[in-house]
Amino acid sequence: MTIIPSFISTSQVQASTTSVAAKALGIDVASYQSADLSAHAKAGSQFAIVKVSEGTSYRNPKGASQIKSAIANDMMPMGYHFATFSSNASLAKKEAQYAISSAKALGLPKGSYLACDYETGQGNIITNGKSVTAKAILAFMDEIKAAGYQPLLYASSSVLQNNINTPSIVKKYPNSLWVAAYAISGRVDKPNFKYFPSMDGV
C-alpha cells in the first residue's frame, strides 16, 4: 500500500490512502527503535504506527524521521499517543490537542490514523470505572476526528474487557480497536491470523 502525499493550499500534507488491507503486516515504533524503517518494509511491513507524543509535554524525537521513512518506503504512516489522562475527559481533550499538534509537527499526513494508547504507566490510572473511562477516551477520539485524523484505541484485551465500556467506543467508532493480545509468550515468526480479530471492533 503506497502513500503519496499531496500538498494543498494550506501546505497541510494529506494522506492519499486511509485504509489497510485485511491481513496486512505492519509495525509500531517509538524512540527506542531506529529512524530508518526500510528493513521493515523489505520484510513485508505495509504500515508503520509511530509514537508521536505522550501526556502534554513529550514528543517523539525520532517521530519525524520515522514518518518520513515510512512514506519513503511505501508504508502507510500512522501515529499514536500514550495517554496519561486516566478518566479525566477535560485532560483527555488537552492531550488530544497536544497529540494533534505533535502529529502535524512531525509530518503525519492529515487523514491518517492517530491512536490513543491506553494502558497503565506514567501515572495513567485505568481502574476508575468503565463508563467514565470510556467517556474520557471518546473525548480524546472526538478531538482527533475533528482535527481531520482517524481515531483508534489501542489497549490490551484485558483492559478493553475489564476497564473500559468498549461497546460504547465501538458504537461511535466502528472497527477502531487496536488490540494487544497474544496467544503465547515469546517469539512468533509468522502471524496467526486465526487468532485475530480477538473481539468486535478490531
What are these regions (language model features)?
Residues 4, 15, 38, 61, ...:
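Intrinsically disordered, low-complexity regions
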Residues 105-114, 121-202:
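Surface-exposed substrate-engagement region within the catalytic domains
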Residues 2-22:
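Sec-dependent signal peptide cleavage junction
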Residues 6-8, 45, 89, 172:
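A general, composition-driven signal for non-globular sequence regions
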Residues 17-147:
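Substrate-binding cleft of extracellular glycoside hydrolase catalytic domains
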Residues 5-10, 31, 96-99, 159-162, ...:
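Short amphipathic alpha-helical surface micro-motifs
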Residues 11, 81, 155:
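Glycine-rich, histidine-containing beta strand-loop boundary motifs that form or position
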